[in-house]
């Protein structure tokens, strides 16, 4: 339940340190427990679960409680707001290191950096395992599916088209995608539409025909036979 998760986070926060020495980067700190609590309460307060009308129509009261609260309660938003404020207060007053990332000057470069640099002080908790250029972990976790060769390593995770469609265009309007079933569209047309998206998309997703590491000048393309390697 939400109460159980919140209670566990609060208990953990009472015992976790604010930071570790650099060699232990990635271990859970107090702020991570506070942030998880804040996220749980934010989800709980959202219309998905905090609503008079459930996202799945059910008549069984027990089943209704399994998919969300039985009714809307505005106080859940107050709990979520207070929990998120506690994370900000911890970052500013207790952590000694957690702050908004303000370098480099270009905001898009800063946005990209949080995806590739686990040491960015804006990140409270990161995955930690990035690997090296020899073990392939970095590529497997960072590259879209099918750009890595199969060999003896698993296919990595990829950004889905549904995820891509969540991004608006640079002008703040929704992108219009060509999705008529059974209809083929020129590859260049799809590329052009991707190029119109919010810069944050290109700072966090690697797509065919783009630079691996923005500004490097090195452009890669995906191939149907999966024979492209980095």
Roles of regions detected by a PLM:
Residues 1-7:
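Conserved catalytic neighborhood of penicillin-recognizing serine enzymes
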Residues 15-26:
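Flexible helix-coil transition and linker loops at the boundaries of alpha-helical arrays
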Residues 2, 27-34, 41-229:
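An aromatic- and glycine-enriched ligand-binding surface/loop that stacks and positions planar moieties
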Residues 9-12, 87:
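Hydrophobic alpha-helical packing residues
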């Amino acid at each position: 339940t939400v109460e159980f998760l919140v209670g566990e986070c609060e208990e953990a926060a009472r015992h976790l340190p604010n930071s570790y020495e650099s060699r232990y980067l990635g271990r859970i700190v107090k702020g991570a427990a506070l942030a998880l609590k804040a996220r749980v309460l934010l989800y709980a307060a959202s219309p998905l679960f905090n609503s008079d009308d459930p996202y799945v129509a059910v008549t069984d009261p027990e089943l209704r409680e399994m998919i969300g609260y039985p009714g809307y309660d505005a106080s859940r938003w107050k709990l979520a707001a207070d929990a998120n404020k506690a994370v900000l207060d911890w970052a500013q007053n207790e952590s000694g290191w957690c702050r908004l990332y303000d370098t480099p000057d270009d905001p898009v470069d800063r946005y990209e950096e949080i995806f590739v640099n686990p040491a960015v002080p804006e990140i409270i908790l990161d995955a930690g395992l990035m690997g090296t250029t020899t073990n392939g972990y970095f590529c497997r976790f960072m590259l879209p599916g099918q750009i890595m060769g199969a060999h003896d390593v698993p296919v990595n995770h990829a950004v889905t088209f549904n995820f891509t469609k969540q991004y608006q265009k640079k002008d703040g309007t929704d992108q219009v995608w060509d999705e008529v079933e059974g209809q083929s569209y020129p590859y260049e047309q799809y590329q052009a539409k991707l190029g119109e998206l919010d810069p944050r998309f290109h700072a966090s997703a690697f797509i065919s025909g783009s630079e691996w590491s923005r500004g490097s000048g090195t452009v890669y393309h995906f191939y149907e036979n999966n024979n492209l390697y980095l």
